[in-house]
Amino acid sequence: MNKFTQHTGIPVPLDAANVDTDAIIPKQFLQKVTRTGFGKHLFHDWRFLDDEGTQPNPSFILNQPIYQDASILLARENFGCGSSREHAPWALTDYGFHAVIAPSFADIFYGNSFNNQLLPIKLSDEQVTQLFNWVTEHAGTPITVDLVAQQVIAGELCFSFEIDAFRRHCMIEGLDSIGLTLQHQAEISAYEAKQPAFMR
């Protein structure tokens, strides 16, 4: 995985609570098991007026020209609730999002996000509301999420966030479960060398 230390990008304010995984990536688009190709279906039922995805809904926030290059998603509480599909963070990252900021996340979505190098940032309701107000007033203006300093910076606003030290380390170093295992390759090889031939 790519290393994540800091990201500066345009935030898009999705002013909705309890956004579930079926809204993030509807079930009819889950046939693939690879991680790519889901971005075009992100928020399909909200982004499009037709089933084929050829008629954009002009009232949906992601379809507004100023947010076309958004890479940070701002949402309300309980983001990613519903089923445990890992396709949800796949769709978000494939679309181009690097971070999601919300007061709270569904537990499984929260864990899946770290596994897919999508940074879920928890801020208080008050801080999220301040960010919504700032983003609305400064639409299209980039903000910064700094994983090393554990801060979200938007103009004069600067909010600190907490994150599990192990997950933070893995994202900063770009380590998934395979990468973590390979860090111990020497120990693994030494252990294997001690085993009887029939066990190798």
From Swiss-Prot:
EC number: 4.2.1.33
Protein family (similarity comment): Belongs to the LeuD family. LeuD type 1 subfamily.
Pathway(s) it belongs to: Amino-acid biosynthesis; L-leucine biosynthesis; L-leucine from 3-methyl-2-oxobutanoate: step 2/4
SUPFAM superfamilies: LeuD/IlvD-like
Classification of source organism: Bacteria, Pseudomonadati, Pseudomonadota, Gammaproteobacteria, Enterobacterales
Keywords: Amino-acid biosynthesis, Branched-chain amino acid biosynthesis, Leucine biosynthesis, Lyase
Enzyme class: lyase
Protein name: 3-isopropylmalate dehydratase small subunit
GO cellular component, one term: 3-isopropylmalate dehydratase complex
Database matches in HAMAP family: LeuD_type1
Short name of one Pfam family: Aconitase_C
InterPro entries: 3-IsopropMal_deHydase_ssu, Aconitase/3IPM_dehydase_swvl, AconitaseA/IPMdHydase_ssu_swvl, IPMI_Swivel, LeuD
Subunit and interaction comment: Heterodimer of LeuC and LeuD.
GO biological process: L-leucine biosynthetic process
